[in-house]
Regions:
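Positively charged, small/polar-rich N-terminal and surface patches that mediate targeting and assembly
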Residues: 1-99
Length: 99
């Protein structure tokens, strides 16, 4: 089965809940990045974010086999989070580690 780069964008306050949910079904390393997003889409923004036009978000990335995606998405769906998440997968042609 091919490997995918799974990328998930979430509200900062939902980060820990999503990490816990993902860990229950997939033990791979998860890369966590804080992001600031300039946007006009304020559907899930806090008051300070609406005033500044800058959304604070967290990006989670991990490499997952395509066959594991249904379980991973189900865990994200069932996570105890407050706000919606955005996700995408990108096919990986090759990857590895160089020591």
């Amino acid at each position: 089965m091919s490997d995918l780069l799974f990328t998930l964008h979430c509200a900062v306050r939902d980060t820990e809940a999503l990490l816990g949910a993902i860990r229950t079904v997939f033990p791979a390393p998860i890369h966590i990045r804080a992001q600031s997003v300039r946007s006009q889409d304020y559907g899930d923004a806090g008051t300070a974010e609406k005033v500044s036009g800058e959304l604070k978000r967290t990006t989670l990335e991990l490499i997952v086999g395509a066959d594991r995606m249904p379980n991973l998405l189900q865990a994200v769906k069932e996570a105890r989070r407050d706000l919606p998440v955005r996700w995408r997968t990108t096919p990986l042609l090759d990857h590895g580690r160089i020591a």
